[in-house]
Amino acid sequence: MAEIKNYTLNFGPQHPAAHGVLRLVLELDGEVIQRADPHIGLLHRATEKLAETKTYIQALPYMDRLDYMSMMCNESAYCLAVEKMLGLEVPIRAKYIRVMFAEITRLLNHLLCVGAGALDCGAMTVMLYAFREREDLLDMYEAVSGARMHAAYFRPGGVYRDLPDTMARHQPNKIRSAKSTEKLNRNRDGSLLDFIDDFTQRFPTYLGEYHTLLTDNRIWKQRTVGIGVVTAERALNLGFSGPMLRGSGVAWDLRKKQPYEIYDRLDFDIPVGKTGDCYDRYLVRMEEMKQSNRIIKQCVDWLRVNPGPVITDNHKIAPPNRESMKSNMEELIHHFKLFSEGFSVPEGEAYATIEHPKGEFGIYMVSDGANKPYRMKIRPPAFVHLAALGEMGRGHMIGDAVAIIGSLDIVFGEVDR
C-alpha cells in the first residue's frame, strides 16, 4: 500500500489574496490545511531605526507609510507619544479635528477591508462600491493636507492647518462632460465641513447597500460562518485587539476603556461579536463604520460653532504662521531652528496607544534629551494577528485560508515595519 504523505504549497508572496507580500507555507493533507507558516519581512524598511536618525518632525512622515491604509491613525499615536514626553497640551479644536480624521481613516480602512475580503471570496461589487465612497474620503484628506494618502497632517502640538473654507471642484475635460462634472460638484459648493456633513448623511444608505449585497447572502455566509473561529479566552491569550478581539466577544476598545483626545465627550457604541468567526468580524467592522459616522457627525457639529487655534503657540515646538514669519525676525529664527535642528525632548520615555482600525497601535518612545528619538518601538496590531494564522487555518480548506486572511485585515507596511 502506498504511503500517504502531506505536501507543501507556497501561497504568495505574489498571490493577489495575500494582501501584500505575505508568503504562506501551507502543509496540506489533500486540500485540508494541517499547518500554515507565515514568512514575513519582505517589506522590512527599518522604520524604527530610521526614526533614530531623524528629528521628531522628520520622523513623522514615516508613520504614514506603516499601515498605508490607516495613515492619520499612525500619526496620531506618534504625536501622542511625543506630546506625552513634552508635557504638551493640545488645543481643543485640534483634538476634535484629529478625532474626526481618525474616524474618517477608520472608514477608509474598513471599507477596503470589507471590500477586499469580499473580492477575495468572489463578490466583486462590494469592492467597487467601497472605492466609490473612499474617493470622497480621500478628497477630505486632500483638502487638508494636499495628499490623498501620506498626509503628514497631524503634528506634535496639533494639526498642520485649520479646515479649509472651500472644496476643490472638478473641471470638464475630454473624458468628462459639463453635465457629469456638475453632478460631481453638487456637494462641493461649501466648506470642507459642509462636504463632510453631506457625506455623513449619505453614508448610512451606502452601508445599507453593503448589507443587502453581503450580510444575508447565502454564499457569503457559507464562506465566512464558522471559519477561523477564535474563542474569547484564546483571543486574549493570543494578544488580539480591535475588531479581532471584539469579534470574539470581548468588549475592549481603548476609545472607551482608556479614552484619549476627546473620545470621552462623544456618544458611540462598541459592537461585539459572539462566535469569533470571519462573519462576526465582518459584522463588527460594518457596525464600527456606522459608529464612526456618528462620531464624525458630532465632530462636525462641534467644529462649526467653536473656532480657535489648531496647534500650540509654543514656537519651539510648532512653526509660526507664514505672515508673522515674514515680518518678524524672532519668528523667522524660530522657523529656521525648527526645520534645521528640530526641537529637543526632555530625557525620559513614553508609551502612547490608540484604537487603530486594526487594533491596538502603540508607540514606545525613549528620549535621551536630544532632538532625535533614542529609541522608537512600534507595536503593530496586524503583526500579532498574523501570528495566529496557523492556528486559525488548521483543519480548513485552502479557499478558507483566503477568507481568514481577509478577516485578519493585514497590511505589510506595519507587519514588517
Curated annotation (Swiss-Prot):
**Which reactions is this enzyme annotated as catalysing?**
a quinone + NADH + 5 H(+)(in) = a quinol + NAD(+) + 4 H(+)(out)
Its top-level enzyme class, in one word, is translocase
EC number(s): the record gives: 7.1.1.-
Q: Which residues form a coiled coil?
A: none
- In which broad location class does this protein mainly occur, judging by the first location in its UniProt entry? membrane
Please list the GO terms describing molecular function.
Answer: NAD binding; NADH:ubiquinone reductase (non-electrogenic) activity; quinone binding
Keywords per UniProt: Cell inner membrane, Cell membrane, Membrane, NAD, Quinone, Translocase, Transport, Ubiquinone
Identify one Pfam family in the record: Complex1_49kDa
What does the entry list under GO cellular component?
plasma membrane
Q: Where in the cell is the protein located?
A: Cell inner membrane
- TM stretches of this protein: none
The name on file for this protein is: NADH-quinone oxidoreductase subunit D
Q: How does it sit in the membrane?
A: Peripheral membrane protein
Stored HAMAP family:
NDH1_NuoD
Q: What's this protein's function?
A: NDH-1 shuttles electrons from NADH, via FMN and iron-sulfur (Fe-S) centers, to quinones in the respiratory chain. The immediate electron acceptor for the enzyme in this species is believed to be ubiquinone. Couples the redox reaction to proton translocation (for every two electrons transferred, four hydrogen ions are translocated across the cytoplasmic membrane), and thus conserves the redox energy in a proton gradient.
Which family is annotated? Belongs to the complex I 49 kDa subunit family.
Record text on subunit structure and interactions: NDH-1 is composed of 14 different subunits. Subunits NuoB, C, D, E, F, and G constitute the peripheral sector of the complex.
